Amino acid sequence: MASKIPVIEIFGPTIQGEGMVIGKKTMFVRTAGCDYACSWCDSAFTWNGEERDRIALMTADEIFRKLKETAGENFSHVTISGGNPLLLKGLGELIELLKQHHIRTAVETQGSRWQDWLTDVDDITISPKPPSSGMRTNFDRLDLMVGKLTHSGSRLCLKVVVFDEKDFDYAKTIHKRFPLVSFYLQVGNPDIISPDRDQLSSMLIQKYQWLIDLTLNAEEMNDAYVLPQLHTLVWGNKRKV
């Protein structure tokens, strides 16, 4: 029997706004459920219950049909987001189906859970959460996950969202722990509800400049990439972009 995957929204095509695939044209499949509760989460609706009535239990075939209904042939890449998609064993069926249709996939996770299907994903971002999130990193699990993916030859990067200098120090720790893995710093968005796109963009550019300055003055970050949250600069806090 086909697995049922809890999906809260499917949208696109749009532009990937984060990490090593920033700027990539992609579709999004956003799953429900997370094992974290980050204080600044911009998709808390996937786990806090406020949109539980919108969750649809869908098979891989149903998700694929919805992607095609939404975008036709106007995509070749699908980002599976959350929540934490790594809670869902059944996503392996979707990954395999997309691969059969020559569609590349991307997944982002905090590195707290493992599923064997992850090695079949084309673009993998592990984003351990810094102190400002209120969460604690299980480094044993993170070490195991990075080790498995590195051994499998997966295309992998690490990304840390930075809100303050404590987060930046945490990012140094992560980068030092995994020096051979591509490493990305991303400025955090402290205002996830403002409807004023221009004001938000101005504030985020200032934060981005601040993060660039920190990085340029930190020899521990000589190999780091510093990125904005691109979709927020372009569209503000708008959903489904």
Predicted segments with their positions:
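Conserved residues at beta->alpha junctions
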Residues: 32, 82, 162
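Conserved AdoMet/S-adenosylmethionine-binding subsite of the radical SAM
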Residues: 75, 86-241
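Conserved Radical SAM active-site core
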Residues: 8-9, 15, 25, 37-122
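Generic signature of intrinsically disordered, low-complexity segments enriched in small/polar residues
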Residues: 14, 31, 43, 48-50, ...
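Conserved beta-strand segments that form the floor/walls of ligand-binding pockets within enzyme
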Residues: 6, 28-30, 42, 79, ...
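Flexible, acidic/Gly-rich N-terminal and inter-domain linker regions that tether
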Residues: 1-32, 36-40, 44, 218-219, ...
